[in-house]
Regions:
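Hydrophobic face of amphipathic alpha-helices that form TPR/SEL1-like repeat modules
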Residues: 24-31, 60-68
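Glycine-centered coil turns and helix-coil junctions that link the paired helices
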Residues: 17, 29-35, 53, 68
Length: 69
């Protein structure tokens, strides 16, 4: 699996407002797949996807709250 290439494509799609890509990018930041692990960035992208109606992203967003992100 080429996580770096996947990250590039998800980032392009997320920046164009694709909700699933925003959630996937959040996951990549959360797990450090293809990019340095960054919980703040993960929460940012989960928040965007949640605002777009992705319920899984909303759950992921809320999971980061107790950690102070």
């Amino acid at each position: 699996q080429d996580y770096k290439k996947a990250f590039e494509w998800y980032e392009k799609a997320a920046n164009q407002g694709l909700i699933e890509a925003q959630n996937n990018l959040g996951n990549m930041y959360y797990f450090g797949q293809g990019v340095k692990q960054d919980y703040k960035k993960a929460k940012e992208y989960f928040g965007k996807a949640c605002d777009g109606g992705n319920q899984i992203a909303c759950i992921n967003y809320k999971k980061l709250n107790p950690w102070g992100y």
